[in-house]
Structure formats: C-alpha cells, structure tokens
Swiss-Prot record:
GO terms for biological process: FAD biosynthetic process; FMN metabolic process. It comes from Methanospirillum hungatei JF-1 (strain ATCC 27890 / DSM 864 / NBRC 100397 / JF-1). This is FAD synthase. ATP binds at T9, F10, H14, P15, G16, H17, N92, H119. Its EC number is 2.7.7.2. The gene is ribL. Pfam families: CTP_transf_like.
Length: 156
C-alpha cells in the first residue's frame, strides 16, 4: 500500500487545490493531507478560513483518504506518524524539493518528494488571486451603487 502525503493551507478552496490533490492521489493508494495550522503560517497572509473549517473542507474532497491538522511545534511529527512513501508539493509551495528531501533524511523519513505541476485551465488557482478579485468586484460594485444613489438624488 503506497501512502502519499500532500500538505498545504487550503484557504478558500479552488480548482488548483483539487488538481493538486487529484494528482497526488494518483501516485498511491491512500492520500493523507496535512492542513497547515493558522499559527504556523508565516510565509503569507493569515488564512481567511479558520483551520478547523479548512480541515473539514479538505476531508470532504473525493481524492482525500485522511486529513489532519499539522503539528504546532514539529512539522515532521505527522509525517513520522503517517510514514508516507511519497510527499507531494504543490506548484506554488515555498519548499525546495531537494532541501525538503535532505531535511526528511535527517529525520530518518524515507519518502520521495514530488512536485505536482501547475493546473492552468482555470483562471483562479490561487486563494490570493480570489481574494483580490473579490476586493476588486466589491469596490466596483460599491462605486456603481454610490453613482446610482447620487443620480437618484440629483447630485450627478
């Protein structure tokens, strides 16, 4: 039985997340997903969705066999417990595969690190891009609403 581990924040689920997990699942028999803890996310803005909700959403996805929250103190602890054969990285994850491979070996974790290619057939494959688009549309709509209200009041 080949165990695959995928990791990530999974904030505001989008087609890129699903692609990453589907491609990861194809590499083995079981897909374990480690969802990053809110407190451990330092390389990008804090998630919009709390960790417990992100965990529930990821666990509900078809390719996922098991989903767990990461460890608050030791990122390798869940990996040691799962004992994966393969660890996948998403196309935009900040880990360097070779550096991660060496760190795993130092922890006596014998897993192959595989980078999953980018999913490009969807315009929204980044949570950050989705948040930007929501902010842009909200701004446009509020301006449109203000202009309409001004016209109705005879101010324009």
């Amino acid at each position: 039985m080949i165990r695959v581990v995928a990791t990530g924040t999974f904030d505001i689920l989008h087609p890129g997340h699903l692609w990453y997990l589907e491609e990861s699942a194809k590499l083995g028999d079981e897909l374990y997903v480690i969802v990053a803890r809110d407190a451990n996310i330092r390389h990008k803005p804090r998630p919009v969705i709390p960790e417990e909700q992100r965990l529930v959403m990821v666990a509900a996805l078809k390719p996922v066999t098991h989903a767990v929250l990461g460890d608050l103190e030791d990122m390798f602890r869940p990996i040691r417990e799962i004992k994966p054969d393969i660890i996948t990285l998403g196309c935009n994850q900040h880990f360097d595969p070779e550096t991660l491979q060496k760190a795993l070996e130092k922890q006596n974790i014998r897993a192959q690190v595989v980078r999953i290619s980018e999913h490009s057939s969807s315009p929204f494959t980044s949570s950050r891009d989705i948040v930007r688009k929501i902010a842009e549309l909200t701004h446009q709509r509020s301006q449109t609403r203000e202009t309409k209200e001004q016209r109705e009041c005879g101010a324009v």
